[in-house]
């Protein structure tokens, strides 16, 4: 297949930088441009360096995250400690650093070398201040960290103290080969972590053609190299010297002008949302659904405020696949938050829960909205549409237009006052003051149909007595509490999900540390209007109960029809996704073969439902968190989850039942 060579784009950072012994001033200076190169590491925070960035028509001195590949972070100091000019490797010998005046706040820029400032070095005992010869009271200062201009400030401030480090002659040049064609034109392929001594530099591999060179500190003799690969690509190995490809390079000898080639191959997983995005914003909170026409919807928060609803602008984005997850549309807004807009409801939208109607090409997306953090919500019947103290709820519909072959989306409509009043007690007093619907998959019944639609079930987080469940028989137009207002199906539950058993019994699965809270609602009769909740079971406290690492994280529960491959018998499998690790990492899918009474009715209690789970596929081998899933029309499970690098990207994985169960089961036809 065709091979492509990709560049290592200059998006990199150095971490954990140990400070070497102070470099003597005599060793820092060159007689002419290019004789000697230095990195100037910020003494107060060694991960930052002094560098040069192009801003408009000017090259400006800036504070940068240290990068072993960056020419703009290498300086040549020509002269003596008492009077020298500062040349930068990226701008060449024709320019040097200057300030237009020696006053506080003056910005350092690159100018013609003959007009550049003469600088002098001031020893600060373990570091140096760099000050203009004409005024030794002010020094070059980092002024706030990454991306901030270098400016003059008092030489007594440690933000203007620098620790020089000589750049050696030994280099490593890295190139990348991808066997085959990826699914998008400019993908992120990997984050390449280079370590030398105690220094680590992470560089992003993207889709531009070229090579990248690493410049190591003087005296470096050993190095390590490791690829953190974005999903959608498989890391094949490093070509290093002679012999077979290797998975990583650890403590290898650093020789002069070493060349390494990294090999990758595309696969059928997809990173749908990269964190950070082009504007530096993160993505979080996945939701996924499959419509009757086979279209798959992958939804995520995009967070310009960098945090949850209540802290500013949050948007909900969507991508659609029409070919079972092979390719995806560009992302678009389902709900566009306005940030500081005067309309409280439109400040932000997030934590989407989605369902595609099983019979019509119609979607419902429920979401939290507004500008209140959930823990601070204070709803009462008297609260108005402009009150900040309410954690609000909104709804969006989408319908497929057969003529245009396009999905038509409504604007978000606030339904706060359709939901909260459901939880008023007999005296008209609120039993819930703050709530949101658990993100991910809204459960649609396979059993209960009243009118045009099969019933929907939504599980609800509240700050008042844990979880509740509500249902709708008109596809989200109106809602009813499942059970009674007094019911507390999971009093200590966090973010919840629901699923339905074949007899109509409703299963609640709620987030908790090291396990799940499980409970079941049993209907009184086949009118499916009244029934009772059991007592919630903490699965990791039950003998043989579902348990995993010490983390508390949102996950998904889903029932699928399967075939037991050992004997070909059809059965139901319950799937539960959650991180398996200690902390938010190693997202996995657990499964449980379901059994029923002879008449097909439920035989489980919350305790027995908690038992008998097996660990299936471990989807992730790194930091990973929230997850959700939906059946696709091709019989695979569309699995959408959060995973490193970059905080959390949103990753789509099409999984077969065989993969999930290590070959024990297959999907039923």
PLM-predicted stretches and their roles:
Residues 267-669:
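Asp-box/BNR beta-propeller blade signature and adjacent active/binding-site loops
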Residues 220-248:
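Surface-exposed interfaces of beta-sheet-rich extracellular modules
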Residues 169-171, 176-178, 228, 247-266:
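Conserved "repeat-terminator" motif of extracellular CCP/Sushi domains
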Residues 9-18:
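Bacterial N-terminal signal peptides
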């Amino acid at each position: 297949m065709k091979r492509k060579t990709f560049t290592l784009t200059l998006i990199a950072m150095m971490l954990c930088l140990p400070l070497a012994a102070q470099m003597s001033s005599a060793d820092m200076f060159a007689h002419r441009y290019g004789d000697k190169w230095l990195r100037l590491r910020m003494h107060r925070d060694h991960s930052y360096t002094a560098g040069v960035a192009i801003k408009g028509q000017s090259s400006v001195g800036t504070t940068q995250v240290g990068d072993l590949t960056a020419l703009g972070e290498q300086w040549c100091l020509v002269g003596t400690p008492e009077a020298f000019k500062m040349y930068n490797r990226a701008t060449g010998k024709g320019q040097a650093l200057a300030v237009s005046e020696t006053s506080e706040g003056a910005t350092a820029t690159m100018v013609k070398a003959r007009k550049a400032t003469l600088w002098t070095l001031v020893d600060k005992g373990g570091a140096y201040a760099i000050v203009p010869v004409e005024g030794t009271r002010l020094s070059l200062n980092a002024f706030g960290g990454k991306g901030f201009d270098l400016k003059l400030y008092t030489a007594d401030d440690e933000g203007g103290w620098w620790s020089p480090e000589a750049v050696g002659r030994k280099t490593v040049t890295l190139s990348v080969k991808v066997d085959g064609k990826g699914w998008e034109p400019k993908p992120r392929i990997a984050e390449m972590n280079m370590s030398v001594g105690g220094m680590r530099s992470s560089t992003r591999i993207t889709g531009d053609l070229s090579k990248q060179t690493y410049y190591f500190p003087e005296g470096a003799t050993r190095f390590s190299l490791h690829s953190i690969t974005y999903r959608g690509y498989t890391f094949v190995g490093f070509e290093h010297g002679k012999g077979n490809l290797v998975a990583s390079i650890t403590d290898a000898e650093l020789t002069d002008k070493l060349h390494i080639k990294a090999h990758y191959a595309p696969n059928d997983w997809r990173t749908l949302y990269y964190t950070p995005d082009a504007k530096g914003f993160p993505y979080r909170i996945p939701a996924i659904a499959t419509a009757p026409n086979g279209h798959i919807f992958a939804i995520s928060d995009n967070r310009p405020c960098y945090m949850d609803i209540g802290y500013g602008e949050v948007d909900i984005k969507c991508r659609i696949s029409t070919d079972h997850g092979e390719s995806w549309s560009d992302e678009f807004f389902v709900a566009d938050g306005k940030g500081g807009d005067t309309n409280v409801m439109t400040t932000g939208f997030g934590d989407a829960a989605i369902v595609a109607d099983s019979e019509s090409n119609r979607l419902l997306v429920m979401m939290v909205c507004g500008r209140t953090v959930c823990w601070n919500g204070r709803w009462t019947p008297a609260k108005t549409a402009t009150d900040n103290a309410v954690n609000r709820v909104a709804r969006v519909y989408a319908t497929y237009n057969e003529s245009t072959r396009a999905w038509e989306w409504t604007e978000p409509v606030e339904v706060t006052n359709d939901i909260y009043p459901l939880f008023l007690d007999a005296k008209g007093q609120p039993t819930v003051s703050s709530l949101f619907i658990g993100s991910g998959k809204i459960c649609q019944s396979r059993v209960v149909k009243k009118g045009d639609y099969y019933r929907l079930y939504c599980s609800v987080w509240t700050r008042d007595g844990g979880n509740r469940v509500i249902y709708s028989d008109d596809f989200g137009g109106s809602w009813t509490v499942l059970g009674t207002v007094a019911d507390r199906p999971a009093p200590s539950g966090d973010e919840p999900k629901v699923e339905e058993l074949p007899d109509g019994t409703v299963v609640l699965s709620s987030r908790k540390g090291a396990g799940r809270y499980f409970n079941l609602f049993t209907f009184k009769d086949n009118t499916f209007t009244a029934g009772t909740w059991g007592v919630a079971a903490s699965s990791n406290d039950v003998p043989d109960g579902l348990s995993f690492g010490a983390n508390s994280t949102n996950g998904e529960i889903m029932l699928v029809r399967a075939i037991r491959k050992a004997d070909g018998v059809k059965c139901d499998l319950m799937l539960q996704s959650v991180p398996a690790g200690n902390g938010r990492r190693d997202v996995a899918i657990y499964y449980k073969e379901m059994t029923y009474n002879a008449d097909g009715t439920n035989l489980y209690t919350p305790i027995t439902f908690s038992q008998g789970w097996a660990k299936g596929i471990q989807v992730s081998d790194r930091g990973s968190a929230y997850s959700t899933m939906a059946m696709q029309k091709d019989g695979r499970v569309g699995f959408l989850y959060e995973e490193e690098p970059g905080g959390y990207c949103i990753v789509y994985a099409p999984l077969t039942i065989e993969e999930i169960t290590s070959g024990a089961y297959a999907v039923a036809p």
